[in-house]
Amino acid sequence: MNRKIENHFLYVEVSDRGAELMRIMRKDTGAEILWNGDPAFWSYRSPILFPNVGSTWQKKMKINGKEYQTRQHGFAREKEFTCVEEGTEKLRYRLMSDEETRKYYPFDFVLWVEFGY
């Protein structure tokens, strides 16, 4: 689901999937600020890269003697975030660790993402 916020100058859309900015448009000119996500080239627009940026050596990491598989740019960009606050000028999202995330990142976490003016 895409959620929207705006003020006098900007119109913004954010996806619950990955808490990713999908659109930033200037209201005065109609100019689009973000890449349009053309899947022929790159379907993302502004992904949140967590818990790692890029790839790890052989797509693995070792923590406390145990090996874990990693994913390029982490997993947050593919997870559904919970929108915990939604207003006309503010969105606040939360992603919490779960059984699936612990397969790749063996720590409990809460990742907060906030958009607003």
Which residues does each predicted region cover?
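Surface-exposed acidic/polar loop and edge beta-strand patches at domain peripheries
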Residues: M1-Y117
